[in-house]
């Protein structure tokens, strides 16, 4: 830690921190327009100027210096900022009219803050054509060229789709004499550029550029001219689509003349701390019919008579708690196949420190295994990209399917394709590289073999050739001829020199030396050749802060038990941090609270709670203003209509807040029929079991915000893991030797949602551009002789599934990426995992 003095106040800050971030952490305000926390500074607005030890600097890109004296609000600085704002306000009315940003516009705020009361400058307006991409509308006439959109697209999202390009606009040099240097620089930048979409592939369902825009230049298409900022009520909640559990804010306003019916107009995020994906931003249009259901008795009878309860991966902690209590009372089984595999995995892995998303950003090397990272947890993908761009980290993404979106993040991003089912072997490779002893490595060691080191052999031959040439040149010098021959005998040793007794032994040894390298047949069979092995090893040895991301495909792996034991050993014996991506929004909460059973698809009476069953208790998926699309037997509130909590990837228990009214019953009302006393779900929040890591904190006392020093004050972190006891019992037995791949698994189908699709709510959303369906690469689409939007039927044995065909720009391989929602009751597909071989049924 170092100390600085800002405006007479002594503060402590981290070495390497920018002056701006240090000031913000200490609660000292320095105005900015272009800066985004955690991203590279652009120095576009220059509003963050300060005096540091008597010299003017820009605080966003100036590193904190020990004992520095800084002033942020001298009269000179305030005059300079006012001058800059006057240039921003050229031809811009100070009383904004119909602009959607009015009331929350940073240009308005800064204009008032700096005291701009008149406009001394004027220039002819230029024609600037409107543009649009994905869900964004771009009005360059309102753009101030702060380039926040470019910055977040590059440093957070990792797409590089936006760029500041040249524009031929009026920028008279006469202002150079009347404007200050910084103000003229800002003016020139604004008048000579425009934001353009330069992506090589289309952009879908993102909107982070809309979120960061400080003015009205970028807006959400469906929000345009529908509501004013000051009319909207902000409800801070948690996104429940994936395990990231991002902080979101619902912007809600009455929709009818009586004010009884409310509508979510948009979703915002705290973009300084938490970028969100398109699902969190746009899939807010699905909820339950507000009246709910009245057939409580029918739901209670169904639970009394059932043999099992199938639960969804997004049920709240409180709902999971009630269901587990009822299981103990009625002795039924609880099914959720994804969460079951995750729970079994955790029972072997045990207590492992969960790195925060911020820790991912500070890593030097990130390795992913068993994960299609961009679809499973976008926030983790954003954090990895941020580490690559700002921390100069490297990425090794290991998966049977190459993801070009990851490969193109930067030059230090390496996508390694391997055989299906090889994850256990790859983990053994990491243990070997880290010199961690384990019985698991026996089969790997047994497959060791030596091969000729072609590169070293070539270098040796070059060296010998060079030595021979030198010897021949030496022979031309008479008096040194014999001496040179003697000196070069050993270096030029060949079989012809066998008769030379003096150097006989050395020559034989020299000629017998052939440079070799060690390889492992097990790795070769898994798809890891020697070059790839050496690249991974070099990156691993170079890094002093490595992070291993484990995806959901690992939990259902045939060798999941052994993989979990190997990961526990890795965590204990090395400094590598493990990030486990839960397979659904609240899988960690469910696994911590419920005793799950493996579903064997026998004929049983099953009640589905936020899942399908013979009797279904779930949201009826009503898109606002339309009829419900899902038939359910008892309507529950959707997750944007209730109070409760979920547990995210960091093990953080986070609050859900209702944005829309719901007048019906929830699960706590059903449970009252079994003697439970809780009148609503939040009466369970502080009763969640402490032995499972939860804390006795009431729902209303849960916080949900970030502070300027980037500290996370959202909910609370789980305590001691409930899985450590069982994991210690598993430690009594050694890891099993890694199983070789008996044969390569041929596949042409992969079970995975596209980006922004996670569950029933996202499937039903009409706001999202990416839909559930069958996705293929551009080359495969051409080979199939089909077009996007056509229906395609795939078969497996005697079963068929049909879906709409879409294009995945990040794919190269000839594979059908099938959305899980298409399976429905087609149990013949993907019996052995998420990879399968299917047939294309030709249309009649």
Predicted regions and their residues:
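A cross-kingdom feature strongest in bacterial/archaeal respiratory oxidoreductases
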Residues: 1, 30, 35-39, 324, ...
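Active-site phosphate/pyrophosphate-binding segments
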Residues: 411-483, 487-610, 691-720
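Residue-level detection of beta-strand-connecting loop/turn positions
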Residues: 8, 54, 796-798
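Short acidic (Asp/Glu) and glycine-rich catalytic loops that position anionic groups and cofactors
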Residues: 61-66, 189-192, 405-411, 543-550, ...
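Short acidic, S/G/P-rich loop/turn micro-motifs used as interaction or catalytic elements
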Residues: 315-317, 371-376, 553-559, 613, ...
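N-terminal leader/propeptide and maturation segments of large enzyme subunits in energy/redox metabolism
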Residues: 94-123, 129, 149, 159-165, ...
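N-terminal single-stranded DNA-binding subdomain of primase/primase-helicase replication proteins
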Residues: 45-63
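N-terminal export/assembly segments and adjacent metallocofactor-ligating motifs
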Residues: 1-24, 32, 36, 40, ...
């Amino acid at each position: 830690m170092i100390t600085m003095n800002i405006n007479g106040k002594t503060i402590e800050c981290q070495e390497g921190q920018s002056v701006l971030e240090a000031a913000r952490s200490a609660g000292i305000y320095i105005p900015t327009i272009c800066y985004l926390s955690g991203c590279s500074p652009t120095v576009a607005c220059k509003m963050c100027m300060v005096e540091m030890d008597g010299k003017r600097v820009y605080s966003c890109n100036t590193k904190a210096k020990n004992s520095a004296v800084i002033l942020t609000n001298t009269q000179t600085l305030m005059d300079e900022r006012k001058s800059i704002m006057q240039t921003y306000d050229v031809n811009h009315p100070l009383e904004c009219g119909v602009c959607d940003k009015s009331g929350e516009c940073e240009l308005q705020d800064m204009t008032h803050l700096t005291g701009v009361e008149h406009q001394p400058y004027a220039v002819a307006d230029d024609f600037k054509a409107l543009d649009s991409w994905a869900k964004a509308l771009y009005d360059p006439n309102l753009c101030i060229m702060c380039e926040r959109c470019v910055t977040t697209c590059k440093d957070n999202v990792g797409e590089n789709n936006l760029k500041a390009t040249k524009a031929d606009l009026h920028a008279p040099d006469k202002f150079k004499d009347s404007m200050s240097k910084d103000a003229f620089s800002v003016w020139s930048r604004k008048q000579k550029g425009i934001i353009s979409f330069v992506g090589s592939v289309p952009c879908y369902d993102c909107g982070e550029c809309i979120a960061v825009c400080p003015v009205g230049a970028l807006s959400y298409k469906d929000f345009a001219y529908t509501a004013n900022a000051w009319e909207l009520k902000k409800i801070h909640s948690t996104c429940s689509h994936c395990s990231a559990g991002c902080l979101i804010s619902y912007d809600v306003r009455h929709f009818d003349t009586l004010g009884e019916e409310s509508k979510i107009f948009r979703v915002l995020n705290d973009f300084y701390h938490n970028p969100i994906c398109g699902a969190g931003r746009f899939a807010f249009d699905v909820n339950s019919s507000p009246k709910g259901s009245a057939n409580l008795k029918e739901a209670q009878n169904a639970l009394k008579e059932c043999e099992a309860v199938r639960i969804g991966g997004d049920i709240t902690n409180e709902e999971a708690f009630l269901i587990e209590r009822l299981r103990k009372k009625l002795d039924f089984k609880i099914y959720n196949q994804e969460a079951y595999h995750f729970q079994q995995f955790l029972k072997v892995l045990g207590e492992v420190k969960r790195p925060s998303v911020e820790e991912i950003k500070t890593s030097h090397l990130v390795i992913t295994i068993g994960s299609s990272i961009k679809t499973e947890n976008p926030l983790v993908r954003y954090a990895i990209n941020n580490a690559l761009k700002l921390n100069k980290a490297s990425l090794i993404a290991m998966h049977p399917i190459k993801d070009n979106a990851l490969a193109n993040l930067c030059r230090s991003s390496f996508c390694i394709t391997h055989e299906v089912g090889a994850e256990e072997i790859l983990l053994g490779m990491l243990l070997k590289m880290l010199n961690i002893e384990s019985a698991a490595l026996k089969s790997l060691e047994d497959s060791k073999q030596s091969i000729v080191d072609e590169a070293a052999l070539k270098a040796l031959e070059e060296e010998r050739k060079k030595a021979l040439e030198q010897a021949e040149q030496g022979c031309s010098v008479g008096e040194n001829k014999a001496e040179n021959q003697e000196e070069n005998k050993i270096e030029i040793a060949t079989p012809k020199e066998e008769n030379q007794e003096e150097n006989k032994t050395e020559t034989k040894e020299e000629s017998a030396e052939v440079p070799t390298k060690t390889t492992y047949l097990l790795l070769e069979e898994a798809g890891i050749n020697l070059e790839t092995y050496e690249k991974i090893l070099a990156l691993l040895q170079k890094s002093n802060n490595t992070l291993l991301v484990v995806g959901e495909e690992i939990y259902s792996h045939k060798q999941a038990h052994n993989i979990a034991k190997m990961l526990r050993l890795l965590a204990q014996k090395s400094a590598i941090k493990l990030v486990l991506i839960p397979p659904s929004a609240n899988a960690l909460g469910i696994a911590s609270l419920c005793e799950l059973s493996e579903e064997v698809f026998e004929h049983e009476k099953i009640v589905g709670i936020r899942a399908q069953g013979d009797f279904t208790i779930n949201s009826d998926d009503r898109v606002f203003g339309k009829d419900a699309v899902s038939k359910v037997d008892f309507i529950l509130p959707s997750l944007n209509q209730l109070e409760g909590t979920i547990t995210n990837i960091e093990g953080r228990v986070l609050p859900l807040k209702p944005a829309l009214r719901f007048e019906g019953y929830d699960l706590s009302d059903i449970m009252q029929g079994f003697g439970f006393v809780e009148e609503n779900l939040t009466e369970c929040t502080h009763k969640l079991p402490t032995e499972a890591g939860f804390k006795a904190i009431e729902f209303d006392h849960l916080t949900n915000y970030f502070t300027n020093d980037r500290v996370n004050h959202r909910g609370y972190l789980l305590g001691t893991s409930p899985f450590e006891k069982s994991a210690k019992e598993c430690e009594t037995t050694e890891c099993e030797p890694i199983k070789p791949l008996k044969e390569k698994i041929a596949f042409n189908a992969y079970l995975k949602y596209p980006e922004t699709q996670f569950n029933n709510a996202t499937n039903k959303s009409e706001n999202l551009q990416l839909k559930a369906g069958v996705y293929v690469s551009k080359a495969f689409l051409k080979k199939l002789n089909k077009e996007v939007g056509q229906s395609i039927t795939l078969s497996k044995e005697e079963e068929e599934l049909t879906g709409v065909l879409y294009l995945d720009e990040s794919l190269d391989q000839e594979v059908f990426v099938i959305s899980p929602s298409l399976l429905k009751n087609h149990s013949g597909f993907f019996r052995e995992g998420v990879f399968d071989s299917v047939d294309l049924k030709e249309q009649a």
